[in-house]
Amino acid sequence: MRAAEVAPLQIAMFCNPRFDHGPADWHRDITSCREGPLEGLFTDFIANPPAYVQWNIALFDDDVLWLLPGSHRRFNTDAENKQLSISENKPLDGGIPIELKAGDGVVYMNTILHWASNYSTKLRRTLQFVYRAFGNGILPHVHWYTWQPEVIDRLPATLAARFEHFLELKQHERDLMEQIFRAIINKDKEMFHKNLATLHSGQEGRMTCLVLLSKQAWKLRLHPNDPMRDRFTERERELLWQRFVHLDGLLQTHSPQLVPGFQNKEPTRYIFNEMPDFDVNDFVASWDS
């Protein structure tokens, strides 16, 4: 990941159900309304170091997971969309089972098409570790912790100190986001460009970072428990969102659509695949439109 720091986003275990639930759906762990168009995500991690990875480590033999190699770097093909439109819970042409023996692991990105092929009663205990980078100049499309700070009190002292440090890393990132948002609110172009380049140093993919920031600005308005919400007044939150309205409109179509293989299960106006013909300078210019 070429990062100064790496922190766990999630620590979990996959276990077999008590009853046979059969296969799940082929999917990428993203939605168009939450992470933005797929093109932005794969453009970013092709051009820059990866900022997010998932590990599955099997404690017992596990062949539940299937992957479609290379699909994290491209759109679905027409043939794949046709097959997925018929059924999202059958083997997909080109998909391969990941046959883990006890002690084996597989590392992958959650934007790849993958499938839990059979939730049966066969014993399954597979650890999942999800990591994100800090300090490699990329904002990952998943950048929030699923673990709660209260867990630190239950950890050994040395491990608790590490998790306290992880919270500090996230706090510093929120501080930087706040500086970016305040520059947008105040139409301070110089500070905006400077701080955005700090958050996402790669020129390629910086627009993807801006799309992710637009999603954060949306959450500030509507999610009362967002950890950054209290940093801004209600007027500031509304003004910030107004700066993003034009970009948000470009990320939508006139009528709802649904592309198979995403976590979206209902049609949405938010575009699944292509990024708009719009760059960071266009975004700055839109503040006065």
Put a short name on every predicted segment.
Residues 1-102, 115-122, 129-143, 225, ...:
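Non-heme Fe(II) oxygenase catalytic core, chiefly the N-lobe of the double-stranded beta-helix
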Residues 112-289:
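Non-heme Fe(II)/2-oxoglutarate
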